[in-house]
Amino acid sequence: MKKLLLIGAGHAHLHIMKKFQEEQLDIEVTILSPSDYQYYSGMFSGYMEGVYSEKDMRVHLPSLADLAGITFIKGAALSIDAKGKVVLTEKGDVLSYDLLSMDIGSYTAGIDVPGARSHALRIKPNYRIEEVAEKMWGAEYPVVVGGGAAGIEIALSLTARRKKEGKKAVTLISHSTLLQSSSLKAQSKIEQIARSKKMNLILKEKVANVTTTSVITSGGKEIPYDQLLWLTGPKAPEMFRASKLPIDEAGYLLVEDTLQVKEYPAIFAAGDCATLRDYPDLPKAGVVAVRQSEVLWENIKAFLQEKDGVRFQPKKAYLSILSTGEKEGLLLYGKITLHHNLSWKLKNKIDRRFMEKYKTTNL
């Protein structure tokens, strides 16, 4: 019997696990993931604010795997021998495969700033969210670094929580305007929202150094903190470069529109960890991984049956809804920018519906 090895339990692999409940294939399936839980990042802002519990935003992987007839192994991959078709884990175990699929997300960029690695909190890998949240909730002077969607959402959600508790506002530091990769209208709107909620914004200044008590910017500002959260965008996993697999300039695994590595067609990848050769500018966002998930499933089946796979075609625009705290949301879709409580209600509905598909227990 052939072996399928799933590395990571991101959005696309959750879908694969669910499909194995519905459709049995003549294949032995194993999933390797560093935590018993897979956390859904779309709900992190609501969790930070106190809208969701930890159980709302996580999937118990051993239970889901058991229902799908999949072997769950708690651990992380260290390297891949694509020619020998084996994966070495951080514990020293060697896992063989006939078919390998990667869905391990990304890591945190910019952490090489002096002092950041030793003093800043990081959410990635995502199973750190509960520990990080506890520390940020208890902070007297919380500071968030990062002006992208993740940094803004978390900072606004913490600000909303702290407002209810009568605590000081959150400070957000960004080397650019907020939401730099979005439209000028969206950039202007999110800054207006942040300022209206009394958030302390330090924009267009890079972090030059981090001490045990202060963040020092390139402009010479010294911002005191007792908890510092680093949310500066995605960085590729080092494993692909170390394993001498085909990668793009940033180190992400390079795949074709079938989600396969051209040089090693038995290796698939989806989500943030991969770059599509024909669509290199596709955003590193969960919505993309969700749309790739059915393509991944169909192409795993096609590979086993020695048939041609289907091709992933990105949409021209993706719906994005940022939680801005107090059950309001900023909806972005193409040229549409809308800030309203109805935007948050739509986001809440989408997120809860996603989680309901994979929840198997109350763990």
Located regions from the model:
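Beta1-alpha1 glycine-rich phosphate/pyrophosphate-binding loop at the start
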Residues: M1-I70, E153-S182
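Internal hydrophobic alpha-helix adjacent to the cofactor/substrate pocket in enzyme cavities
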Residues: V287-K315
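C-terminal auxiliary extensions adjacent to catalytic cores
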Residues: E326-L363
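FAD-binding core/adjacent interface of flavoenzyme oxidoreductases
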Residues: M1-L5, L67-Y141, L229
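FAD-binding beta-loop-beta segment adjacent to the flavin cofactor pocket
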Residues: G251-F268, Q313, K327-I336, S343
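FAD-site-proximal beta/loop scaffold in flavoenzymes
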Residues: S118-G138, E222-Q227, L231-R291, E298-N299
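Residue-level detector of alpha-helix initiation sites
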Residues: H11, Y127, A149-A150
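A Rossmann-like FAD-binding core segment of flavoenzymes
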Residues: D26, F72, L78-S79, L95, ...
